[in-house]
Amino acid sequence: MDEGIEKNIFVNLESQIDGVCPKFYVNVDDIDIIHEPPEFYQRLKKLIKKAQKRIFLSTLYIGKEERELINCLSNALSNNPSLHVHILADQLRCTRESPGCCSASLLMQLKKKFPDRCEIKLYHTPNLRGLRKQLVPHRFNEGWGLQHMKIYGADDNLIISGANLSRDYFTNRKDRYYLFSDKGLADFFFKTHFLFSQLSFECIPHLSDSSIQLSSTSPVIPFTLKWNNSCPNPLTNPQEFRVAASAKIQQLLQGNREKFLSRNPSKPLSSVYGSELINQAGDDNNKPFHKYEESAIVYPLFQCVPILTSDVHSTEEKVLSIIGTLLSRKEVNWTLTAGYFNVYPALRKQLLKSEGIGEVIVASQQANGFYRSPGPSKLIPPAYQYIAEQFLKDSRKKKRNIDVLQWQNKGNTYHAKGFWLSTQHHKHPFLTTIGSSNYTSRSQQLDLESTLVVMTQNEKLKRKFSTEIELIKQHTKPMNTCQLEKVPMYVKALTSLMKKKL
Protein backbone atom coordinates (compact mmCIF):
# COMPACT_ATOMS: atom_id res chain seq x y z
CA MET A 1 0.00 0.00 0.00
CA ASP A 2 2.78 2.44 0.98
CA GLU A 3 4.75 1.56 -2.16
CA GLY A 4 1.64 2.25 -4.19
CA ILE A 5 1.24 5.75 -2.74
CA GLU A 6 4.76 6.81 -3.71
CA LYS A 7 4.50 5.21 -7.16
CA ASN A 8 1.18 6.95 -7.77
CA ILE A 9 2.62 10.33 -6.74
CA PHE A 10 5.68 9.70 -8.91
CA VAL A 11 3.73 8.74 -12.05
CA ASN A 12 1.26 11.62 -11.70
CA LEU A 13 4.08 14.11 -11.19
CA GLU A 14 5.92 12.74 -14.21
CA SER A 15 2.86 13.08 -16.43
CA GLN A 16 2.37 16.71 -15.38
CA ILE A 17 5.98 17.78 -15.90
CA ASP A 18 6.12 15.96 -19.26
CA GLY A 19 3.90 18.64 -20.78
CA VAL A 20 6.15 21.51 -19.70
CA CYS A 21 9.80 20.84 -20.53
CA PRO A 22 12.37 18.49 -22.11
CA LYS A 23 12.84 15.05 -20.58
CA PHE A 24 15.80 12.68 -20.33
CA TYR A 25 16.30 9.19 -18.98
CA VAL A 26 19.70 8.61 -17.39
CA ASN A 27 21.07 5.34 -16.06
CA VAL A 28 21.48 5.72 -12.29
CA ASP A 29 25.04 4.41 -12.54
CA ASP A 30 25.84 7.47 -14.67
CA ILE A 31 24.91 9.92 -11.90
CA ASP A 32 27.45 10.81 -9.23
CA ILE A 33 26.84 13.19 -6.32
CA ILE A 34 29.87 15.23 -5.24
CA HIS A 35 29.80 16.49 -1.66
CA GLU A 36 32.71 18.82 -0.93
CA PRO A 37 34.28 21.87 -2.67
CA PRO A 38 37.80 20.39 -3.05
CA GLU A 39 36.34 17.23 -4.62
CA PHE A 40 34.29 19.36 -7.02
CA TYR A 41 37.44 21.19 -8.12
CA GLN A 42 39.46 18.01 -8.56
CA ARG A 43 36.71 16.31 -10.57
CA LEU A 44 36.29 19.40 -12.75
CA LYS A 45 40.02 19.54 -13.51
CA LYS A 46 40.03 15.82 -14.27
CA LEU A 47 37.19 16.23 -16.78
CA ILE A 48 39.04 19.14 -18.42
CA LYS A 49 42.29 17.17 -18.71
CA LYS A 50 40.53 14.19 -20.31
CA ALA A 51 38.39 16.19 -22.75
CA GLN A 52 38.90 15.35 -26.44
CA LYS A 53 36.30 17.44 -28.30
CA ARG A 54 34.63 20.14 -26.25
CA ILE A 55 34.67 21.95 -22.93
CA PHE A 56 31.79 24.30 -22.17
CA LEU A 57 31.58 26.30 -18.96
CA SER A 58 28.57 28.49 -18.13
CA THR A 59 29.09 30.40 -14.89
CA LEU A 60 28.57 33.74 -13.20
CA TYR A 61 32.32 34.35 -13.23
CA ILE A 62 35.74 32.76 -13.06
CA GLY A 63 37.79 34.13 -10.18
CA LYS A 64 40.24 36.79 -11.32
CA GLU A 65 43.13 34.90 -9.69
CA GLU A 66 42.21 31.38 -10.90
CA ARG A 67 45.40 30.93 -12.89
CA GLU A 68 45.55 27.22 -12.07
CA LEU A 69 42.18 26.65 -13.75
CA ILE A 70 43.21 28.74 -16.77
CA ASN A 71 46.47 26.76 -17.00
CA CYS A 72 44.48 23.53 -16.82
CA LEU A 73 42.35 24.67 -19.77
CA SER A 74 45.45 25.86 -21.63
CA ASN A 75 47.24 22.53 -21.16
CA ALA A 76 44.18 20.63 -22.36
CA LEU A 77 44.06 22.76 -25.52
CA SER A 78 47.81 22.32 -26.07
CA ASN A 79 47.62 18.56 -25.67
CA ASN A 80 44.67 18.08 -28.01
CA PRO A 81 44.51 20.08 -31.28
CA SER A 82 40.88 19.03 -31.88
CA LEU A 83 39.63 20.39 -28.54
CA HIS A 84 37.53 23.59 -28.34
CA VAL A 85 36.73 25.58 -25.19
CA HIS A 86 33.54 27.64 -24.85
CA ILE A 87 33.02 29.93 -21.84
CA LEU A 88 29.84 31.87 -21.03
CA ALA A 89 29.81 34.23 -18.04
CA ASP A 90 28.23 37.48 -16.88
CA GLN A 91 29.61 40.73 -18.26
CA LEU A 92 28.83 42.95 -15.27
CA ARG A 93 30.43 40.52 -12.82
CA CYS A 94 33.43 39.64 -14.99
CA THR A 95 34.38 43.27 -15.68
CA ARG A 96 33.54 44.76 -12.28
CA GLU A 97 37.15 45.50 -11.30
CA SER A 98 38.15 46.78 -14.75
CA PRO A 99 40.45 48.51 -15.66
CA GLY A 100 42.20 46.56 -12.91
CA CYS A 101 42.66 42.82 -12.98
CA CYS A 102 39.29 41.12 -13.47
CA SER A 103 37.81 37.85 -14.67
CA ALA A 104 37.63 39.07 -18.28
CA SER A 105 41.29 40.14 -18.35
CA LEU A 106 42.36 36.74 -16.98
CA LEU A 107 40.36 34.94 -19.66
CA MET A 108 42.11 36.96 -22.37
CA GLN A 109 45.32 35.04 -21.64
CA LEU A 110 43.56 31.92 -22.88
CA LYS A 111 41.93 33.66 -25.83
CA LYS A 112 45.23 35.17 -27.02
CA LYS A 113 46.96 31.81 -26.92
CA PHE A 114 44.16 29.91 -28.67
CA PRO A 115 42.22 32.51 -30.70
CA ASP A 116 40.49 29.98 -32.95
CA ARG A 117 39.70 27.31 -30.36
CA CYS A 118 38.62 29.37 -27.37
CA GLU A 119 35.37 31.35 -27.30
CA ILE A 120 34.59 33.80 -24.48
CA LYS A 121 31.02 35.15 -24.35
CA LEU A 122 29.72 37.60 -21.72
CA TYR A 123 25.98 38.07 -21.22
CA HIS A 124 24.66 41.55 -20.39
CA THR A 125 21.16 42.09 -19.04
CA PRO A 126 18.95 44.39 -21.14
CA ASN A 127 17.64 45.88 -17.87
CA LEU A 128 20.71 48.06 -17.20
CA ARG A 129 21.82 50.45 -19.92
CA GLY A 130 22.27 54.10 -20.82
CA LEU A 131 22.37 56.75 -18.09
CA ARG A 132 21.29 54.31 -15.36
CA LYS A 133 24.27 52.08 -16.10
CA GLN A 134 26.61 55.06 -15.91
CA LEU A 135 25.21 56.18 -12.56
CA VAL A 136 24.96 52.84 -10.74
CA PRO A 137 28.23 51.91 -8.95
CA HIS A 138 29.88 48.72 -10.22
CA ARG A 139 29.46 47.07 -6.82
CA PHE A 140 25.66 47.33 -7.12
CA ASN A 141 24.96 46.95 -10.85
CA GLU A 142 24.40 43.20 -10.46
CA GLY A 143 21.04 44.06 -8.87
CA TRP A 144 19.56 44.50 -12.37
CA GLY A 145 20.20 40.93 -13.49
CA LEU A 146 22.92 38.37 -14.18
CA GLN A 147 23.87 35.24 -16.11
CA HIS A 148 23.64 32.92 -13.10
CA MET A 149 23.59 29.42 -14.67
CA LYS A 150 26.27 26.96 -13.51
CA ILE A 151 26.79 24.31 -16.23
CA TYR A 152 30.18 22.64 -16.60
CA GLY A 153 30.57 20.22 -19.51
CA ALA A 154 33.44 18.22 -20.99
CA ASP A 155 32.73 15.87 -23.92
CA ASP A 156 29.80 13.71 -22.73
CA ASN A 157 30.15 14.58 -19.03
CA LEU A 158 28.27 17.31 -17.26
CA ILE A 159 28.39 18.89 -13.79
CA ILE A 160 25.28 20.83 -12.76
CA SER A 161 25.84 22.97 -9.68
CA GLY A 162 25.19 26.23 -7.90
CA ALA A 163 28.92 26.87 -7.48
CA ASN A 164 30.94 29.47 -9.35
CA LEU A 165 34.52 28.94 -10.50
CA SER A 166 36.59 30.75 -7.89
CA ARG A 167 38.85 29.91 -4.97
CA ASP A 168 36.26 29.88 -2.17
CA TYR A 169 33.99 27.55 -4.19
CA PHE A 170 36.97 25.21 -4.59
CA THR A 171 37.93 25.24 -0.91
CA ASN A 172 35.43 26.27 1.77
CA ARG A 173 32.16 27.44 0.20
CA LYS A 174 29.68 24.57 0.50
CA ASP A 175 27.42 23.95 -2.49
CA ARG A 176 25.89 20.99 -4.36
CA TYR A 177 27.28 19.24 -7.45
CA TYR A 178 25.80 16.46 -9.63
CA LEU A 179 27.96 14.77 -12.25
CA PHE A 180 26.14 13.15 -15.19
CA SER A 181 27.89 10.92 -17.73
CA ASP A 182 25.23 10.98 -20.44
CA LYS A 183 25.71 12.02 -24.06
CA GLY A 184 22.11 13.09 -24.64
CA LEU A 185 22.09 15.38 -21.61
CA ALA A 186 25.54 16.78 -22.41
CA ASP A 187 24.53 17.45 -26.04
CA PHE A 188 21.41 19.27 -24.87
CA PHE A 189 23.32 21.53 -22.51
CA PHE A 190 25.97 22.22 -25.13
CA LYS A 191 23.16 23.43 -27.40
CA THR A 192 21.85 25.47 -24.47
CA HIS A 193 25.28 27.02 -23.96
CA PHE A 194 25.52 27.84 -27.67
CA LEU A 195 22.04 29.41 -27.69
CA PHE A 196 22.76 31.77 -24.79
CA SER A 197 26.16 32.56 -26.29
CA GLN A 198 24.29 33.87 -29.35
CA LEU A 199 22.61 36.34 -26.99
CA SER A 200 25.88 37.55 -25.46
CA PHE A 201 28.83 39.79 -26.28
CA GLU A 202 32.07 38.31 -27.54
CA CYS A 203 35.06 39.17 -25.38
CA ILE A 204 38.27 39.43 -27.38
CA PRO A 205 41.78 40.80 -26.74
CA HIS A 206 42.77 44.30 -27.76
CA LEU A 207 45.65 44.62 -30.17
CA SER A 208 48.61 46.12 -28.32
CA ASP A 209 48.58 49.25 -30.46
CA SER A 210 44.88 49.96 -29.89
CA SER A 211 44.37 49.08 -26.24
CA ILE A 212 42.14 51.33 -24.22
CA GLN A 213 43.92 53.38 -21.56
CA LEU A 214 41.88 55.71 -19.36
CA SER A 215 44.85 57.92 -18.44
CA SER A 216 48.63 57.89 -18.53
CA THR A 217 48.70 56.29 -15.09
CA SER A 218 45.79 53.83 -15.43
CA PRO A 219 46.19 50.20 -16.46
CA VAL A 220 45.49 49.15 -20.02
CA ILE A 221 42.18 47.33 -20.52
CA PRO A 222 43.26 44.14 -22.32
CA PHE A 223 39.89 43.24 -23.82
CA THR A 224 37.06 44.60 -25.88
CA LEU A 225 33.41 43.54 -26.10
CA LYS A 226 31.83 43.06 -29.52
CA TRP A 227 28.23 42.41 -30.51
CA ASN A 228 28.45 40.18 -33.58
CA ASN A 229 25.18 38.24 -33.35
CA SER A 230 22.24 38.22 -35.75
CA CYS A 231 19.76 39.49 -33.13
CA PRO A 232 19.63 43.16 -31.99
CA ASN A 233 21.97 44.51 -29.31
CA PRO A 234 20.28 44.35 -25.84
CA LEU A 235 21.83 47.68 -24.79
CA THR A 236 20.61 49.68 -27.79
CA ASN A 237 17.44 47.78 -28.85
CA PRO A 238 16.20 45.91 -25.76
CA GLN A 239 12.66 45.28 -27.00
CA GLU A 240 13.77 43.93 -30.38
CA PHE A 241 16.41 41.87 -28.56
CA ARG A 242 13.72 40.25 -26.39
CA VAL A 243 11.61 39.37 -29.44
CA ALA A 244 14.58 37.69 -31.13
CA ALA A 245 15.72 36.00 -27.91
CA SER A 246 12.22 34.67 -27.22
CA ALA A 247 12.06 33.06 -30.65
CA LYS A 248 15.37 31.28 -30.03
CA ILE A 249 14.57 30.20 -26.47
CA GLN A 250 10.97 29.06 -26.91
CA GLN A 251 11.92 25.76 -28.53
CA LEU A 252 14.51 25.12 -25.82
CA LEU A 253 11.98 25.77 -23.04
CA GLN A 254 9.28 23.58 -24.53
CA GLY A 255 11.62 20.87 -25.73
CA ASN A 256 9.59 19.95 -28.84
CA ARG A 257 6.86 18.78 -26.51
CA GLU A 258 4.44 18.11 -29.38
CA LYS A 259 6.92 15.59 -30.76
CA PHE A 260 7.48 14.22 -27.27
CA LEU A 261 3.79 13.78 -26.49
CA SER A 262 3.24 12.01 -29.81
CA ARG A 263 6.13 9.58 -29.27
CA ASN A 264 5.64 5.82 -29.54
CA PRO A 265 4.21 4.83 -26.14
CA SER A 266 5.79 1.39 -26.44
CA LYS A 267 9.19 3.09 -26.22
CA PRO A 268 8.74 5.48 -23.30
CA LEU A 269 12.44 5.88 -22.69
CA SER A 270 13.11 7.64 -25.99
CA SER A 271 13.34 11.32 -25.15
CA VAL A 272 12.98 14.20 -27.56
CA TYR A 273 16.72 14.70 -27.57
CA GLY A 274 17.65 11.05 -27.97
CA SER A 275 18.85 10.26 -24.46
CA GLU A 276 17.81 6.72 -23.68
CA LEU A 277 18.63 3.61 -21.70
CA ILE A 278 19.77 0.60 -23.69
CA ASN A 279 19.34 -3.02 -22.68
CA GLN A 280 22.99 -4.06 -22.57
CA ALA A 281 22.11 -7.75 -22.17
CA GLY A 282 21.05 -7.89 -25.81
CA ASP A 283 17.92 -9.93 -25.08
CA ASP A 284 15.60 -7.43 -26.74
CA ASN A 285 17.78 -6.40 -29.69
CA ASN A 286 19.02 -3.36 -27.74
CA LYS A 287 15.60 -1.70 -27.73
CA PRO A 288 14.93 0.93 -25.06
CA PHE A 289 13.28 -0.51 -21.98
CA HIS A 290 11.30 1.17 -19.25
CA LYS A 291 12.26 0.36 -15.68
CA TYR A 292 11.81 3.05 -13.08
CA GLU A 293 14.05 1.04 -10.77
CA GLU A 294 17.07 1.33 -13.08
CA SER A 295 16.80 4.89 -14.32
CA ALA A 296 16.41 8.50 -13.30
CA ILE A 297 14.17 10.97 -15.07
CA VAL A 298 15.87 14.33 -15.59
CA TYR A 299 14.02 17.51 -16.53
CA PRO A 300 16.02 20.65 -17.43
CA LEU A 301 14.32 23.86 -16.27
CA PHE A 302 15.19 27.43 -17.17
CA GLN A 303 14.36 30.85 -15.81
CA CYS A 304 15.06 33.70 -18.23
CA VAL A 305 12.33 36.32 -17.75
CA PRO A 306 14.55 39.39 -18.47
CA ILE A 307 15.15 38.32 -22.08
CA LEU A 308 11.66 37.03 -22.90
CA THR A 309 8.58 38.77 -24.22
CA SER A 310 5.47 38.62 -22.04
CA ASP A 311 3.88 35.81 -24.08
CA VAL A 312 6.79 33.38 -23.53
CA HIS A 313 7.14 31.85 -20.09
CA SER A 314 10.05 30.20 -18.30
CA THR A 315 9.69 26.58 -17.25
CA GLU A 316 11.19 26.68 -13.75
CA GLU A 317 8.31 28.51 -12.11
CA LYS A 318 5.73 26.25 -13.80
CA VAL A 319 7.37 23.04 -12.62
CA LEU A 320 8.05 24.33 -9.11
CA SER A 321 4.36 25.21 -8.89
CA ILE A 322 3.49 21.61 -9.82
CA ILE A 323 5.91 20.32 -7.19
CA GLY A 324 4.60 22.84 -4.66
CA THR A 325 1.05 21.58 -5.12
CA LEU A 326 2.21 18.17 -3.87
CA LEU A 327 3.14 19.68 -0.51
CA SER A 328 -0.53 19.98 0.42
CA ARG A 329 -0.65 16.16 0.63
CA LYS A 330 0.04 14.86 4.13
CA GLU A 331 1.94 11.87 2.67
CA VAL A 332 4.62 14.16 1.21
CA ASN A 333 7.61 15.34 3.27
CA TRP A 334 10.10 17.87 1.98
CA THR A 335 13.43 19.58 2.56
CA LEU A 336 14.40 22.89 0.98
CA THR A 337 17.77 24.54 1.29
CA ALA A 338 18.96 27.94 0.12
CA GLY A 339 22.07 29.81 1.16
CA TYR A 340 20.06 32.94 0.43
CA PHE A 341 16.60 31.95 1.68
CA ASN A 342 13.99 34.37 0.35
CA VAL A 343 11.59 32.27 -1.73
CA TYR A 344 9.25 34.11 -4.05
CA PRO A 345 5.68 34.70 -2.72
CA ALA A 346 3.84 31.92 -4.60
CA LEU A 347 6.31 29.26 -3.46
CA ARG A 348 6.35 30.63 0.09
CA LYS A 349 2.58 30.30 0.18
CA GLN A 350 2.78 26.66 -0.97
CA LEU A 351 5.41 25.84 1.66
CA LEU A 352 3.22 27.29 4.39
CA LYS A 353 0.28 25.17 3.19
CA SER A 354 2.22 21.91 3.45
CA GLU A 355 0.56 19.12 5.43
CA GLY A 356 3.56 16.80 5.75
CA ILE A 357 6.86 17.30 7.55
CA GLY A 358 8.98 20.13 6.16
CA GLU A 359 12.52 21.37 6.70
CA VAL A 360 14.22 24.55 5.56
CA ILE A 361 18.03 24.72 5.79
CA VAL A 362 19.51 28.22 5.71
CA ALA A 363 22.94 29.76 6.21
CA SER A 364 23.69 31.28 9.59
CA GLN A 365 24.94 34.86 9.51
CA GLN A 366 28.49 33.58 10.02
CA ALA A 367 28.10 31.16 7.08
CA ASN A 368 26.89 33.91 4.73
CA GLY A 369 29.60 35.00 2.31
CA PHE A 370 28.88 38.66 3.07
CA TYR A 371 29.37 38.33 6.83
CA ARG A 372 31.33 41.35 8.12
CA SER A 373 32.09 42.47 4.58
CA PRO A 374 32.92 46.16 3.99
CA GLY A 375 30.24 48.63 3.00
CA PRO A 376 26.47 48.11 2.74
CA SER A 377 26.83 44.41 1.84
CA LYS A 378 27.49 43.65 5.52
CA LEU A 379 23.72 44.13 6.02
CA ILE A 380 22.92 41.12 3.80
CA PRO A 381 23.46 38.35 6.43
CA PRO A 382 21.14 39.91 9.05
CA ALA A 383 18.57 40.58 6.31
CA TYR A 384 18.44 36.88 5.39
CA GLN A 385 18.29 35.88 9.05
CA TYR A 386 15.28 38.18 9.47
CA ILE A 387 13.55 36.61 6.45
CA ALA A 388 14.12 33.10 7.86
CA GLU A 389 12.87 34.18 11.30
CA GLN A 390 9.69 35.57 9.74
CA PHE A 391 9.10 32.35 7.83
CA LEU A 392 9.50 30.28 11.00
CA LYS A 393 7.14 32.63 12.84
CA ASP A 394 4.50 32.32 10.10
CA SER A 395 4.78 28.52 10.03
CA ARG A 396 4.18 28.41 13.79
CA LYS A 397 1.13 30.64 13.41
CA LYS A 398 -0.30 28.27 10.82
CA LYS A 399 0.63 25.27 13.01
CA ARG A 400 2.67 23.65 10.27
CA ASN A 401 5.18 20.91 11.00
CA ILE A 402 8.12 22.86 9.57
CA ASP A 403 11.58 23.25 11.08
CA VAL A 404 14.07 25.93 10.07
CA LEU A 405 17.67 24.75 10.52
CA GLN A 406 20.75 26.96 10.46
CA TRP A 407 23.92 25.69 8.79
CA GLN A 408 27.24 26.69 10.33
CA ASN A 409 30.66 25.09 10.00
CA LYS A 410 33.60 27.12 11.27
CA GLY A 411 35.75 28.51 8.49
CA ASN A 412 33.18 27.66 5.80
CA THR A 413 30.35 29.48 4.06
CA TYR A 414 27.11 28.02 2.69
CA HIS A 415 25.78 28.38 -0.85
CA ALA A 416 23.73 25.19 -1.42
CA LYS A 417 20.20 25.25 -2.79
CA GLY A 418 17.58 22.71 -3.82
CA PHE A 419 14.51 20.63 -2.97
CA TRP A 420 14.11 17.02 -1.87
CA LEU A 421 10.73 15.23 -1.72
CA SER A 422 9.93 11.95 0.02
CA THR A 423 6.81 10.18 1.26
CA GLN A 424 5.83 9.48 4.87
CA HIS A 425 6.77 5.81 4.97
CA HIS A 426 9.95 6.11 2.90
CA LYS A 427 13.09 7.58 4.42
CA HIS A 428 14.79 8.23 1.10
CA PRO A 429 13.70 11.04 -1.28
CA PHE A 430 12.42 10.18 -4.74
CA LEU A 431 13.03 13.68 -6.15
CA THR A 432 15.58 16.45 -5.90
CA THR A 433 16.28 19.70 -7.72
CA ILE A 434 19.83 20.85 -8.42
CA GLY A 435 21.10 24.02 -10.08
CA SER A 436 21.74 27.73 -9.80
CA SER A 437 18.40 29.11 -8.61
CA ASN A 438 17.77 30.24 -5.02
CA TYR A 439 14.01 30.41 -5.83
CA THR A 440 13.89 34.10 -4.92
CA SER A 441 11.90 36.90 -6.55
CA ARG A 442 15.21 38.24 -7.79
CA SER A 443 16.25 34.99 -9.51
CA GLN A 444 12.72 34.57 -10.85
CA GLN A 445 12.54 38.01 -12.45
CA LEU A 446 16.09 39.23 -13.08
CA ASP A 447 18.59 36.40 -13.60
CA LEU A 448 19.22 33.59 -16.07
CA GLU A 449 18.91 30.33 -14.12
CA SER A 450 19.22 26.63 -14.90
CA THR A 451 17.87 23.84 -12.67
CA LEU A 452 17.39 20.10 -13.03
CA VAL A 453 14.59 18.02 -11.55
CA VAL A 454 15.92 14.51 -10.91
CA MET A 455 13.31 11.82 -10.11
CA THR A 456 13.88 8.13 -9.48
CA GLN A 457 12.45 4.94 -8.03
CA ASN A 458 15.92 3.42 -7.81
CA GLU A 459 16.80 2.68 -4.17
CA LYS A 460 20.54 3.13 -4.69
CA LEU A 461 20.13 6.67 -6.03
CA LYS A 462 17.47 7.51 -3.44
CA ARG A 463 19.93 6.53 -0.71
CA LYS A 464 22.46 8.89 -2.31
CA PHE A 465 19.89 11.68 -2.03
CA SER A 466 19.50 10.84 1.67
CA THR A 467 23.25 10.80 2.24
CA GLU A 468 23.53 14.24 0.68
CA ILE A 469 20.93 15.67 3.07
CA GLU A 470 22.50 13.95 6.08
CA LEU A 471 25.94 15.37 5.30
CA ILE A 472 24.47 18.86 5.03
CA LYS A 473 22.50 18.46 8.26
CA GLN A 474 25.63 17.42 10.19
CA HIS A 475 26.37 21.12 10.52
CA THR A 476 22.86 22.39 11.34
CA LYS A 477 20.89 23.29 14.44
CA PRO A 478 17.21 24.24 14.78
CA MET A 479 16.95 28.00 14.46
CA ASN A 480 14.80 28.28 17.58
CA THR A 481 17.64 26.76 19.65
CA CYS A 482 20.40 29.01 18.26
CA GLN A 483 21.74 32.15 19.88
CA LEU A 484 20.93 34.53 17.05
CA GLU A 485 22.52 37.90 16.51
CA LYS A 486 19.90 40.61 16.94
CA VAL A 487 18.71 42.14 13.68
CA PRO A 488 18.54 45.97 13.93
CA MET A 489 15.22 47.66 13.17
CA TYR A 490 16.66 49.61 10.24
CA VAL A 491 17.82 46.32 8.64
CA LYS A 492 14.31 44.92 9.02
CA ALA A 493 12.88 48.02 7.34
CA LEU A 494 15.41 47.89 4.50
CA THR A 495 14.76 44.17 4.02
CA SER A 496 11.05 44.81 3.57
CA LEU A 497 11.80 47.53 1.01
CA MET A 498 14.48 45.62 -0.91
CA LYS A 499 13.09 42.08 -0.67
CA LYS A 500 12.70 41.68 -4.44
CA LYS A 501 16.40 42.43 -4.95
CA LEU A 502 17.60 39.80 -2.45
Curated annotation (Swiss-Prot):
The record lists the catalysed reaction(s) as: a CDP-1,2-diacyl-sn-glycerol + sn-glycerol 3-phosphate = a 1,2-diacyl-sn-glycero-3-phospho-(1'-sn-glycero-3'-phosphate) + CMP + H(+)
Residue stretches making up the PLD phosphodiesterase domain:
143-169, 410-443
Identify the domain of life: Eukaryota
Q: Its Enzyme Commission number? A: 2.7.8.5
Principal EC category = transferase
GO BP term (any one): mitochondrial membrane organization
Pathway in which this enzyme or protein is active: Phospholipid metabolism; phosphatidylglycerol biosynthesis; phosphatidylglycerol from CDP-diacylglycerol: step 1/2
Q: Which coarse location class describes where this protein primarily resides?
A: mitochondrion
Query: Where found in the cell?
Result: Mitochondrion
Q: Could you name the active-site residues?
A: H148, K150, D155
Q: Name one GO molecular function term.
A: ATP binding
Instruction: Tell me the InterPro entries matching this sequence.
Output: PGS1, PLipase_D/transphosphatidylase
Residues crossing the lipid bilayer are none
Disulphide bridges = none
Q: Which family does it belong to?
A: Belongs to the CDP-alcohol phosphatidyltransferase class-II family.
Q: Any idea what job this protein has? A: Functions in the biosynthesis of the anionic phospholipids phosphatidylglycerol and cardiolipin.
According to UniProt, the name of this protein is CDP-diacylglycerol--glycerol-3-phosphate 3-phosphatidyltransferase
Q: Which organism is it from?
A: Schizosaccharomyces pombe (strain 972 / ATCC 24843)
**Organism classification:** Eukaryota, Fungi, Dikarya, Ascomycota, Taphrinomycotina
Q: Supply the gene name.
A: pgs1
